[in-house]
Swiss-Prot record:
Residues 6-63 form the HTH lysR-type domain. Belongs to the LysR transcriptional regulatory family. This is Nodulation protein D 2. GO terms for biological process: regulation of DNA-templated transcription. Residues 23-42 bind DNA. Transmembrane segments: none annotated. SUPFAM superfamilies: Periplasmic binding protein-like II, Winged helix' DNA-binding domain. It comes from Bradyrhizobium diazoefficiens (strain JCM 10833 / BCRC 13528 / IAM 13628 / NBRC 14792 / USDA 110). The lineage of its organism: Bacteria, Pseudomonadati, Pseudomonadota, Alphaproteobacteria, Hyphomicrobiales. Pfam families: HTH_1, LysR_substrate. Keywords: Activator, DNA-binding, Nodulation, Repressor, Transcription, Transcription regulation.
Amino acid sequence: MRFKGLDLNLLVALDALITERNLSSAARKINLSQPAMSAAVARLRKHFRDELFGMRGRELVLSSRAEGLAAPVREALMHIELSIMARHPFDPARLNRRFRIVLSDFVTVVLFRNVVARVTREAPAVSFELAAPTDEHELLLRRGEVDFVIRPDFFMSSTHPRAALFEERLVCVGCCTNRELQPRLTFDRYMSMGHVAVKHGGAPRTPVEHSFLTDLGPTRRIDILVQSFSMIPPLIVGTNRIGTMPLGLVRHFQRTMPLRIVELPHPFPAFTEAVQWPSLHNSDPGSLWMRDILFQEATRMATTQELRVTSSPEDAEPPGHFVRSVSPLP
């Protein structure tokens, strides 16, 4: 089919090239041979009178013209897809789709592994591509290159819809044998102890720690920098080092490691983990279905945490472990 001289099938090829940034991957995505995809690139360049793509190794680098086409082309294809899908009842059991999601190791452990288990039962043909958070999530949403971003809500873009999932807070964690880690940790002791800290971007602190540490001024003694929260527990067990981590993640590691949880020496407000999706996916049945699962599993997680705290004494945490419930969202 042609529209004003353009074969509309080329838009499908263009969208795949923009999304995959690799000729072979884009060809596989839309079931074309590599020579056929190369021919499509030549036709696209001729139509738009622009190179559209350069090469950096095996990666395609978009020209400014291709950058400008990314969102409109994705949105146009999504509208066509939704119009076709609207004629048929949505059935997750028959859904064959890969969801691309940006989320942290923390969210993966405390929430998303349960989401994956449920989706495997309800929609066995659905798969996932998970990516670590970056500073470019708004651009990824605008291009439609990801289906969801799960991050603290204060990092969310104002140009796309979002919804709260659950609340969390940071705590101090150390090994149960760490005699320097007292139940009431003073600020001076906290700052002087050796820390295993997460490096986010170029800064030796996570974004959720930023206001806590910036407001208080002094710099922590950082012994080890790591790339994720999940790397902290193995590096503090059997040592006098401490870390600052989300409470839910520490509870997960407490099942297999001798960890002690202590309140931070200065009040730090809870933060809300939220989910955001591209505006053009707002009415997408698959996106709506996945959102419902995220909301339901987040509520289930919060309820389970409440039950743990209110359970009988024999089910309580071992002595020396501090536990406080994370309030579920209203």
